[in-house]
Design a protein with these regions (language model features):
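ATP phosphate-binding glycine-rich loop and adjacent ATP-lid/helix-beta elements
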Residues: 125-152
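Short acidic helix/loop segment immediately C-terminal to the autophosphorylated histidine
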Residues: 1-11, 33-34
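Acidic ATP/Mg2+-coordinating residue in the GHKL
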Residues: 118
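Short beta-strand/loop element within the Bergerat-fold HATPase_c
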Residues: 98-110
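Glycine-rich nucleotide-binding loop
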Residues: 100, 122, 154-160
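Short beta-to-alpha transition helix within the HATPase_c
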Residues: 12-20, 24, 36-53
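Conserved short strand/loop->alpha-helix "switch" segment adjacent to the catalytic nucleotide/phosphoryl-transfer site
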Residues: 55-86, 90-100
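Conserved short alpha-helical segment within the C-terminal cytosolic histidine kinase catalytic core
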Residues: 25, 29, 46-58, 136, ...
């Protein structure tokens, strides 16, 4: 009988969470009449609650401001991105005092914007990306959403994603 090491367990848990994020899209679509677009605020709120339940320990407040309507195809990629960024913040950004994660959504002239910011300990955003999660976020943003991502580290980490 083979046992997973810690890395394997972590990867499996993250894959399970990504699958649950896609399931959340289906739940929201069943509750509404328009099945081609959905409220990002509702979806990300449900998703953030689900992710938070998986991380006990310190208290983290997750707030969502604004709303945009996104196509189902975009929602799948955005859900995985939110999952990765929120999970990273929950795992690495905060000490025993907890903290806050803010997700801001807006759209101007067809350009959508999603900001995910935490008030945690931060890291060097200019260093080469070595984590699978952040590499996935960058790849999905650029290749699938045909957008861009920028990150800054001041009083925590802020990721700003833009796409059409």
């Amino acid at each position: 009988k083979k046992h997973l090491d810690e890395t394997g367990k972590t990867m499996l848990a993250e894959a399970e969470q990504n699958i649950r994020s896609i399931g959340k899209i289906h739940e929201i679509l069943y509750r509404q009449q328009n099945i081609s677009r959905l409220s990002a605020k509702e979806y990300f709120g449900d998703l953030a609650d689900e992710i938070k339940r998986g991380y006990s320990g310190h208290f983290v407040d997750i707030r969502i401001e604004g709303d945009i309507q996104i196509a189902v195809e975009q929602a799948i990629y955005c859900g995985i991105i939110i999952n990765e960024l929120v999970t990273n913040a929950l795992k690495y950004a905060f000490d025993e005092n907890g903290g806050r994660i803010d997700i801001k959504l807006s759209e101007t002239g067809g350009q959508k914007s999603m900001t995910v910011a935490d008030n945690g300990r931060g890291y060097d955003v200019d260093a080469p990306i070595t984590s699978f999660g952040l590499s996935l976020v960058q790849k999905l943003t650029e290749d699938e959403l045909k957008g861009s991502i920028s990150s800054t580290s001041k009083d925590g980490i802020t990721h700003i994603l833009r796409w059409s």
